[in-house]
Amino acid sequence: MVHPPVGIRSLAVSFPRVIRRNDYYIEKYPELVTQAEQKSLAKMFSLVGDIPSNEFELEMMPYLSDPFRGTVERRVLSPGESSLTLEYRAAKDALDAAKLSTDDVDILLVASFLPEQIGFGNAAFLARELGLQCGAWNLDATCASTPVSLQTACALVQAGGYRNALVVISCTYSRFFDEDDTLSWFFSDGAGAFVVSSLKPNQGILGTKTINTSILCDQFFFKLMEDEQGKQRLRMHVTKGINKAISETAASLLHTCCEGAISAAGITLEEIDFFIFNTASAWFASFCTRVLGIDPERTINVYPLYANIGPALTVGNLYHAAQLGKIHENDLVLIYAFGAASSASASVIRWGDVVLGPVPVNETDSTVKNSETGSIIPC
């Protein structure tokens, strides 16, 4: 069956105003930094044995002497900011870039990790802020939410029931960690949005492969706790065996999804012009290029700018790759992401004439790190 060409028409990102660098923690929590090897972040990312036992641990090795595990900057919500404010800004910028009004949006898909309130997703709340009249659906695939949402939106538009789908992704990890928890050094906040519409012939989504990640179901969990003011707050926790679980499954998930998407698209790995990975650690892009045997120049790593922003990482990497001119119209792009207790997913798309939203606040003089050489590429 031949599907009409459907894919990303515009793309935008949004980040909090506060940029928190390593010096902040060194000055405020010197004892924590000194004792980092006994704290939660170090326990999350350390060798299972005495020597690397797989590609993931091999790429992690150079970062083990760094108490921040390669993290450089984080974006953190400031007073008055929330997942909804980030989502609203990204959504508006994506619509403006596509030259669409709210009346042109036929469906809103929102993946918030996590929503602002317990029990309800952000979709209807964001629709209210945007003034949308269309349906508003919540979608959750944890850190794989971007490719899963892209697949869903493309399928809806290809089926003919919708013309323009607005997809919004956010992650606000800072709400779920105390600042003096070393795990908070690794996580960050951000959002992205894109419009999915009809494109030129042969452009858009060409093939996908998604599998579940039930093997990682028990590695992350949330607890409802009371803070010092007696307010109930969700706090995120990780198990002691998380590093072993991720390092032993990451390569298999990557191979299965990427090879499946490439096969579904009817192409070969060598034909892919550029790769987008959810770079949830400083070394994940290098890990992926090693496992797939591809040139590191064919991908990008925004981790030095944003740390781990969960599902929003994929949108951030896409945005900066396009902004830097690494992706051009009609290039073949492979997008891969995986999330614990959800899915691993890959999509092959032929890039269209994608219009970008404005460069985010505080981003004008920022930099993106080349995953192979460690050099800095100006944005």
Where do the language-model regions lie?
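Residues that mark the start of a beta-strand
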Residues: P5-G7, Y162-N164, L332
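Short acidic, glycine/serine/threonine-rich loops at helix termini
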Residues: I19-R20, G119-N122, Q151, F176-D181, ...
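Claisen-condensing/thiolase-fold acyl-transfer catalytic domains that form or cleave C-C bonds
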Residues: Y88, L114-E116, F125-R128, Q133-A159, ...
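Conserved beta-ketoacyl condensing-enzyme motif
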Residues: E59-Y63, R75-A141, C257, A261-A285
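Short beta-strand segments
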Residues: R9-A12, D140, A165-C171, V196, ...
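Buried hydrophobic positions in well-ordered alpha/beta secondary-structure cores of metabolic enzymes
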Residues: I8, A94, V105-L108, S149, ...
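Condensing-enzyme catalytic core mediating Claisen C-C bond formation in acyl metabolism
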Residues: M1-G80, D181-E248, T256, R350-C379
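Flexible, glycine-rich active-site loops centered on histidine and acidic residues
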Residues: G161-A191
